[in-house]
Amino acid sequence: MTNPQRNAEHVHFLRQLRLFLEEVCCEICRFQVVGHHDVGSEEALVSREVDLGVPGAFADIVVRSPNRPPFFVEVKYGYTSDRMVDHFVRKYSRPSPSVPDADRVVAVVDRAGRSDFEQLEERLRKETRKDLKLEFWDEARLQELVLECFGVKLGALSPEGLFELRNAIDDIKWRWAFGERHVESPLKDSLLWHFGYSRLLQLHKLHGFAPEQILPPRRFRNAVVLLADLSSFSSFVRDTRDDEVMRNALTTFYSNSRHAVINSGGMICQFVGDEVLALFGVPDVQDGYAMRALDCGRSLLQIGSSVSNRWQREIDRVQPSGGVHIGMAIGDIQSVMYRPFCRSHIGIVGDAVNLAARLLAQAETNEIVVANAYFQTLPDREHSGFEEMEPLEAKNVGLIKAWKLHQGSSYSTRGA
């Protein structure tokens, strides 16, 4: 006799496992393109939840790099065969308007326990359009890739084994960034969380920064502040009977949003409920950082639509809208320690944060509303997509000159 509670726990475990494997596969793909020690690794763009230009269809991962065709990665570990085929039909049976030049799809799947694996492989090849090669990463191949990339073995896919693997990978990333000199730094977890190893490596190599020099309590000038918020969040929560569905939706949003920020060279500051706070130009101002912040905002719009789509498929009541809305501003911010003589936990304050929050409140779903000073830092070619707004009245701030950018909605209430 089956145990419904145990079955539900296994389903939720598989969801978390797939999210974790997505993170691992992103690092593997980046490693395959640039290795561990290339400061120019920002040339390899590894994006998650990419809108394929088909209603309700998002690629789990898209990998782009110079002089190579992009390719897709689909993490379908634990999916039933029929469900996996349905997803490939929706995503890859016809050309993608947004990624038309991709040349292959990597399917990350579990072979063990699938008596129909050969038939599944044949079905997926049949439903995938002919110009896309199909490659499989099963348990054995994934073990090889994890060992090649991180130098550690992929052990048991259990909660305990995965906790150990994550900690081992974080230790290795810290060494990639700083070498052996700072292995005992108390800032390891905090800085890896805020920046990711690639950005830390860049700061260490370009400026010689030690961990304690990266985010000291001080003023940072001309930082871009990005605030993103899930639309209709309260409605989604109200209509969700299973708390695990809500928690999984938020974890998916957090994981993908953090990846988008770090992948764009930004700093993930914090999550508050369904809101993301990210900074660009901290601790150093890089060429093109304002444009990368906007690119990150566009990625977050796609991530928000994808998360809302998945959430809608789990509940009965149809939600009128889904996605995110975003506010952005530029200005000085201050980093502040939460406790004396402790750099592990910091807060961010500044007028630019308050201004971005006011603009966020004015943004509709799938819109980015930006302050005029930030708008003027963008290349002229980017101005054409923006629409000037009427001056906005903001409490305790005054009238604000702002611009908005609307991106077509990818939110869909259809599909399973």
Place the predicted regions along the sequence by residue:
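Acidic-basic catalytic patches of nuclease active cores, encompassing PD-(D/E)XK
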Residues: M1-V54
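Conserved catalytic cores of phosphodiester-cleaving nucleases, focusing on short active-site segments
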Residues: L17, V50-L52, A57-P95, R104-A107
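Intrinsically disordered, glycine/charged-rich C-terminal tails and inter-domain linkers
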Residues: D38-V54, S65-P69, V73, K126-K133, ...
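Switch/connector loops and helix/strand junctions flanking conserved nucleotide-binding motifs
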Residues: D82-R83, R114-E121, L145-L147, Q334-Y338, ...
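Nucleic-acid nuclease catalytic cores
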Residues: S96-R141, F375
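Catalytic NTP-binding/metal-coordinating core of nucleotidyl cyclase/transferase enzymes
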Residues: E212-D295
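Catalytic core of nucleotidyl cyclases, primarily class III adenylyl/guanylyl cyclases
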Residues: N263-R292, V307-V349, W403
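Catalytic/regulatory signature loops of cyclic-dinucleotide turnover enzymes
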Residues: A329-I330, D351-A373
